């Protein structure tokens, strides 16, 4: 990939996270990159395609990690704990990401359809989710967890993790004390969500 293309992606990600998709123009991206707008359209054709080129790798991480723990010799519940831990770690790297994802899905519901078709249903990208789906069904059949669809479990986990990072900015400022309190809050939320999901999987 040429350096100018990488720079466009980097600047676009920064502006999308700061201003949202609708609040960011390709003209603004071009100005920040130091290139003309035609060059952005040459590489990415549309702002929508640029958006997905920026954020698809992050969405892929969300789904692909479903497969990572499944190769290890852990029981299912322990793997669920590791998935939640990974999602919190991923979102902690840039806490603007979770509010951005939630806002974009609310403003542009069609993006959820794109996410589902590309990352959960397409033949190539759905392998990790397919393995996760199979494991959930096996655990249900063994009687170790209650009846639940894999997609419902994944969405429950995603919603709970995302909401923690959406709410966190509301109660804390930027001082050192607030940063520490925020970190402690997120650690508590991770523990609470893990307990909630794990307990919710148990058969009644």
Role assignments for model-derived ranges:
Residues 1, 5-13, 47, 190:
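Short, leucine-enriched amphipathic alpha-helices that occur as contiguous helical runs
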Residues 4-12, 29, 54-58, 62, ...:
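Generic hydrophobic, amphipathic alpha-helix propensity
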Residues 7, 15-49, 53-54:
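Helix-turn-helix
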Residues 8-16, 87, 197:
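Short hydrophobic clusters on alpha-helical segments that form packing/core surfaces
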Residues 54-83, 116, 135:
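Amphipathic alpha-helical linker/stalk segments
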Residues 68-99, 150-157:
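Hydrophobic alpha-helical connector segments
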Residues 86-89, 93, 126, 130-142, ...:
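C-terminal peripheral helix-coil segments that are non-catalytic and often amphipathic
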Residues 88-131, 152, 179-186:
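Short secondary-structure transition hinges
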């Amino acid at each position: 990939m040429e350096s100018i293309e990488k720079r466009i992606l980097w600047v676009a990600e920064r502006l999308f996270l700061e201003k949202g998709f609708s609040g960011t123009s390709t003209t603004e991206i071009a100005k920040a990159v130091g290139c003309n707008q035609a060059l952005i359209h040459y590489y990415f054709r549309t702002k929508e395609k640029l958006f997905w080129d920026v954020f698809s790798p992050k969405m892929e991480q969300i789904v692909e990690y479903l497969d990572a723990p499944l190769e290890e010799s852990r029981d299912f519940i322990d793997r669920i704990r590791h998935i939640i831990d990974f999602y919190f770690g991923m979102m902690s790297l840039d806490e603007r990401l979770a509010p951005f994802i939630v806002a974009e899905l609310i403003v542009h519901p069609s993006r959820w359809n794109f996410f589902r078709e590309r990352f959960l249903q397409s033949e190539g990208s759905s392998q990790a989710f397919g393995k996760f789906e199979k494991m959930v069904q096996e655990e249900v059949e063994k009687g170790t967890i209650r009846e639940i669809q894999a997609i419902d479990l994944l969405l429950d986990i995603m919603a709970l993790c995302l909401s923690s990072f959406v709410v966190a900015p509301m109660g804390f400022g930027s001082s050192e004390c607030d940063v520490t309190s925020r970190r402690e809050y997120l650690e508590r939320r991770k523990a609470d969500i893990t307990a909630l999901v794990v307990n919710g999987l148990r058969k009644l």
